[in-house]
Amino acid sequence: RMRLGETYLIAAEAAGRKGDYDLAATYVNKVRERAAWHEGEVKVPQFYTIEGGVNDTHSTYDAIKVTEAQLRNTDFVEFMLDERGRELLGETCRWEDLVRTEKFYEWVKTFNPDATGLKEFHKLRPIPQTHIDRLSPAGVITEEQNEGYY
């Protein structure tokens, strides 16, 4: 299942990778505009504590807008990974994002120091043995299974 926010982020990443940071910022800001507190919106008490004010009903959108210059002057892929992480939290696409951007090994080792058994080949998952058993004619295991799992 795909949401509109994810579609905007895919378009933003595609635009940014092509060097069109202005269009990328437009798409990212569409997502951020939806997520921002809007003028006059009632905020939960926990937000007041973090924000430091009571009955503060101003919009937060201007404070979270991203500009073309910000995208141009940052590691764009890492920026998009962070943005996707916030927007798509819990939607089970983080592994695919990290593998697709070739950041899987680096990020897991950085943010999960207890993952001592992690190897580069873990970016690929093992092909189920039941699938391999059904192949006809049967091939050599090194040709049928992803590297590291044989």
Stretches with model-predicted labels:
Residues 1, 32, 45-150:
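Long, intrinsically disordered, low-complexity segments
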Residues 1-34, 77-87:
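Extended, hydrophobic/aromatic-rich amphipathic alpha-helical segments that build helical scaffolds
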